[in-house]
Amino acid sequence: MKNEVKKVVLAYSGGLDTSIILKWLQDEYNCEVVTFTADIGQGEELEPARKKALSLGIKEENIFIKDLRDEFVKDYVFPMFRANAIYEGEYLLGTSIARPLIAKTQAQIALQTGADAVSHGATGKGNDQVRFELGYLAFNPDLKIIAPWREWDLNSREKLLAYAQKHGIDISKKKGKSPYSMDANLLHISYEGLVLEDPAHAPEEDMWRWSKSPKDAPNESEIIELDFQKGDLVAINGEKLSPAGLLTKLNELGCKHGIGRLDIVENRYVGMKSRGCYETPGGTILLKAHRALESITLDREAAHLKDELMPKYASLIYNGYWFSPERMMLQALIDESQIHANGRVKLELYKGNVIVIGRESSNDSLFNAAYCTFEEDEVYNQKDAAGFIKLNALRFIIAGKNGRKF
């Protein structure tokens, strides 16, 4: 029953939708509301969220605003990039990887404040409802979960606006606010809705909020060097920064050179296809560099095994299973593969392209020019290849002698 909830922690952005949810929770559940706003690098001022919550009757001690940027990159983005994770061949999982941290922190605040429920603003059609709720239940299976979009009858924009006006919630539009449904963090920004709901319709150029069009990017390329330790980025052009600082710097470089735009139709976990556009400038650079480093530091079979496991790992993140035992098992294997992923990668950035022009690892490179040179060598006997080929062809030879045709 609705009156059984005493206190609820709401994932709160300060925007119209979550402000309506806040008021709806107060009215429908007659409960105390705690707001939680996460700073994961979305690029918006968060103090307005505090003021908005106060204006809606939330006590100061029940307003939580947390800077999670470094934790987000260090404990979520970097581990994911050790795996080179991509969903359905293209999507760098920018929204998916942010939800577990938000859910975990929200559940922790519920414990801290004695709340018996949590609430989110994800719709009943999308993946985020699954990601949030799997996260909540992983940390506290006794929490009641309130998903307003699955309960209320405010099922149109007109009804939402009417509810806001009735309850004195400010509905003034922010200057420069995009008409698209957007989600942003340090790894990416996404766009959905409006003309994008027709997959045949190209997005307008003014939709893209972060990056230059590759056509308008500088005519001069830029060379950068990225340093890695155990698979994680530690420095850009020799400058060591915090995890959040490193990704911020990569984003600046990628946006400048028109890198990281993506327009895809993806298969949602709930069963439908969805068209989305994404900008992941820093992540696109990071993925290219990390794979280049692995090309000289990973054993062949280890690298191939990682590539076989990656789609499963990516699907676990996309579908909301970050805290699952199977994801943690895969992570342990992936992290073991990164012990020798130390070195430097040199890249050229130019009009939407990330071009690898050098890679080196002073202590961990498995590239040995003495073995692969096209010049005369003394370490590799080419005659050995004949026996290698014959043994590997043995099954073909036996089948052929048995009359089988291929």
UniProtKB/Swiss-Prot annotation:
ATP binds at A11, Y12, S13, G14, G15, L16, D17, T18, S19, A38, G121. CDD domains: ASS. Pathway: Amino-acid biosynthesis; L-arginine biosynthesis; L-arginine from L-ornithine and carbamoyl phosphate: step 2/3. L-aspartate binds at T123, N127, D128. It catalyses: L-citrulline + L-aspartate + ATP = 2-(N(omega)-L-arginino)succinate + AMP + diphosphate + H(+). It is an enzyme of class 6 (ligase). One of its GO terms (molecular function) is argininosuccinate synthase activity. Its main location: cytoplasm. Its EC number is 6.3.4.5. GO terms for cellular component: cytoplasm. This is Argininosuccinate synthase.
